[in-house]
Swiss-Prot record:
Protein name: (+)-delta-cadinene synthase isozyme XC1
Annotated signal sequence range: none
One biological process term in Gene Ontology: diterpenoid biosynthetic process
Phenotype for D307A: Strongly reduced activity
Keyword check for Zinc-finger: no
UniProt-listed PANTHER family: (+)-DELTA-CADINENE SYNTHASE, OS04G0344100 PROTEIN-RELATED
């Protein structure tokens, strides 16, 4: 990860004659202070909880009830999903979509219905052919000019295009076509359609974080004249109930973090535990994954500390015994590493030992071994980067990529995310994940290449660090912008791979695959305008505020 260099002040707790001139990343302190240390009072009373259950049953009945046509059914299911409450109705929605998949006359559908049907079915793994859009093209192979006046249809085609896989040229064309015409139309549209279009052009449904998108759509949906009052009320209550649960979890994590006292002991490291929780709540937000969220947040917090130790403070000579200690994973190794490394090493081992204790009741200790091995591989990759920096070595782009992909940490996070899941995860799941399957490769490429572009474009990297963009520019003799374009094409290709892996039959259950999808979504949200984790950009601030601070008025 990136850092900007300054000298370690002589007053630092880590300062000595040996390391007064150490490079240190000039990271901002946490912008949240102790805001999340204490959990707020419960914002839902017993009467509201009872109302929540009543509304839940009402919505369930509406999902399965016959409607006038498939367009109404699709639109209602879409609203349920976009409002963030579809996790309550997984089976009902799946049954309805399966029925729509097998019983539908595509020839009669307009652009809106064709597009929303395509998107929803693709989201649920149905391999709907993109040929359904051919009827909206003219004899010259261009989209008909008549569709440009159908703004809602264009908006749905735009959203559907983000579910494309390799070889679907018509959807590649649709992205450009709809983006152009929606951009022209947005200023003349009335609210709330204008807000829907404006937001979509910034963030597609497919690549947005479900909770962030739900929070935004709640404010839009209530202004749609035809909105369903029961669904809206249910979604608002459900949002606040989840927010309270998430605040409780974050409060517990913040107390753990404060007790570690890394702000004083390790002043070179980023204090981003709140942003880390936001990241992981993007991986899975549902109540049943509370344990997984807390464990994975602690892991990403420790991975961030380990990363900063390698990247922003330690000498290569210190990193060799530190890496050896991580490889051996034994508290006895603590005597072999420098004094300042001991707190982070002990905390790292403690986090994984706590994981063992938490999953032992269900005989799932084996899962933690896979998680440990993934962390060890991450540390080993960090050491390679540190060696390159020491030697001022400029690897070829392919050599750099082979090591840089593991250093983004996404394979480690994907594997570790499975530890806190239920019976849907088996030993075969971990064997599959450890084999570097295509979907984990895809999310890793999205992470690595978006990070590389953000670091270089926004100058978030130390001058002595090896840069993927610089490697590519030097090897191929291209400008920075040309390199960005190549990297962005790799990201788009990886998204197509990721979409392909969701089409039935899948290698693993959708709930397993969703972890990689959501990890990719976090990158799209946080890193499109720079490193939004390290430098806490607008997306992170806005997301944390709307999801964890501000409840919805009922």
């Amino acid at each position: 990860m990136a850092s900007q260099v300054s000298q370690m002040p002589s007053s630092s707790p880590l300062s000595s004659n040996k390391d007064e001139m150490r490079p240190k990343a000039d990271f901002q302190p946490s912008i949240w202070g102790d805001l999340f240390l204490n959990c707020p009072d419960k914002n839902i009373d017993a009467e509201t909880e009872k109302r929540h259950q009543q509304l839940k049953e009402e919505v369930r009945k509406m999902i399965v009830a016959p409607m006038a046509n498939s367009t109404q059914k699709l639109a209602f299911i879409d609203s349920v999903q976009r409002l963030g409450v579809s996790y309550h109705f997984t089976k009902e929605i799946e049954d309805e979509l399966e029925n729509i998949y097998h019983n539908n006359n595509d020839a009669e559908n307009d652009l809106y219905t064709t597009s929303i049907r395509f998107r929803l079915l693709r989201e649920h793994g149905y391999n709907v052919s993109c040929d359904v859009f051919n009827k909206f093209k003219d004899e010259q192979g261009n989209f008909k000019s008549s569709v440009t006046s159908d703004v809602r249809g264009l908006l749905e085609l735009y959203q559907a295009s983000y579910l494309r896989v390799h070889g679907e040229d018509i959807l590649d064309e649709a992205i450009s076509f709809t983006t152009h015409h929606l951009s022209l139309a947005v200023a003349s549209l009335d609210h709330p359609l204008s807000e829907e279009v404006s937001h979509a052009l910034k963030q597609s449904i497919r690549r947005g974080l479900p909770r962030v998108e739900a929070r935004h759509y709640l404010s839009v949906y209530q202004d749609i004249e035809s909105h369903n009052k029961a669904l809206l009320e249910f979604a608002k209550i459900d949002f606040n109930m989840l927010q309270f649960l998430h605040r409780k979890e974050l409060s517990e994590i913040c107390r753990w973090w404060k007790d570690l006292d890394f702000q004083r002991k390790l002043p070179y490291a980023r204090d981003r535990v709140v942003e880390g929780y936001f990241w992981i709540s993007g991986v899975y937000f549902e109540p049943q994954y509370s344990l997984g969220r807390k464990m994975l947040t602690k892991v990403i917090a420790m991975a961030s500390i380990v990363d900063d130790t390698y990247d922003s403070y330690a000498t290569y000579e210190e990193l060799i015994p530190y890496t050896n200690a991580i490889e051996r994973w034994d508290i006895k190794c603590i005597d072999e590493i420098p004094e300042y490394m001991k707190p982070s090493y002990k905390a790292l081992l403690d986090v994984y030992e706590e994981m063992v204790q938490l999953v032992a009741e269900h005989g799932r200790q084996y899962r933690v071994e896979y998680a440990k091995n993934a962390m060890i591989r991450l540390a080993q990759s960090y050491l390679v980067e540190a060696k390159w920096t020491l030697q001022n070595y400029k690897p070829s782009f392919e050599e750099f990529k082979a090591n840089a992909l593991p250093t983004c940490g996404y394979a480690m996070l994907a594997i570790t995310s499975f530890v806190g899941m239920g019976d849907i995860v088996t030993p075969e799941t971990f064997k599959w994940a450890a084999s570097d399957p295509k979907i984990i490769q895809a999310s890793t490429i999205i992470c690595r290449f978006m990070d590389d572009v953000a670091e270089h474009k926004f100058k978030h990297r130390r001058e002595d660090d090896c840069s993927a963009i610089e490697c590519y520019m030097e090897e191929y003799g291209v400008t920075a912008q040309e390199a960005y374009d190549v990297f962005n094409k790799h990201v788009e290709s990886a998204w197509k791979d990721l979409n392909q892996e969701f089409l039935k039959p899948t290698e693993m259950p959708t709930e397993v695959l969703n972890r990689s999808l959501n990890l990719a979504r976090v990158m799209d949200v946080l890193y499109r305008e720079g490193d939004g984790y390290t430098y806490v950009g607008k997306a992170a601030k806005g997301g944390i505020t709307s999801l964890l601070i501000e409840p919805i008025a009922l």
